[in-house]
From Swiss-Prot:
It comes from Staphylococcus epidermidis (strain ATCC 35984 / DSM 28319 / BCRC 17069 / CCUG 31568 / BM 3577 / RP62A). Belongs to the OsmC/Ohr family. This is Organic hydroperoxide resistance protein-like 2. InterPro entries: KH_dom-like_a/b (IPR015946), OHR (IPR019953), OsmC/Ohr_fam (IPR003718), OsmC/Ohrsf (IPR036102). Disulfide bonds: none annotated. Coiled coil: none annotated. Transmembrane segments: none annotated. One of its GO terms (biological process) is response to oxidative stress.
């Protein structure tokens, strides 16, 4: 990949009941299958939570950049992303779905929707998932 700005590596072992870590051990996290999927659950995370965390942080960063470019500094963007593991009837496997809820302050609903859509077009996670997972955008202006 020729235009790389940043890269990171994560290693997993043990699948959903294992762990994930970076080679330099700055990130080490145990994994657990959720109870809803027949696992033990508990305080450990899972791939869906990790994906939701990364996507929400990335989307919020993209939105903050769009707002900054439009000289808006008081919107206090909050991005909540829910990732669902869904049955995939096409191959009897699984697929992901995403519900992106964004709250912006001090602007009209119309402006909020415009900026969120711009962020959705710009966000690297949105670009990576576009056409691959169902995404629902829900925008609230306060």
């Amino acid at each position: 990949m020729t235009n790389s700005i940043y890269s990171t590596t994560m290693i997993s072992n043990g699948g959903r009941d294992g762990r994930v870590f970076s080679p330099d051990n700055t990130f080490v996290q145990s994994l657990a299958t959720p109870k809803e999927m027949g696992g033990q659950g508990g305080n450990d995370t899972n791939p869906e939570q990790l994906f939701a965390a990364g996507y929400s942080a990335c989307f919020n960063s993209a939105l903050s950049l769009i707002l900054s470019q439009n000289k808006i500094s008081d919107a206090n963007p909050e991005v909540e992303i829910t990732i669902e593991l869904l049955k995939d009837d096409t191959d009897n496997g699984f697929k992901l779905g995403a519900d992106i809820k964004v709250t912006l302050e001090n602007m009209s609903q119309q402006d909020a929707e415009k900026f969120v859509e711009q962020a959705h077009q710009f966000c690297p996670y949105s670009k990576a998932t576009r056409g691959n997972i169902d995404v629902q955008l829900d925008v609230t202006a306060q």
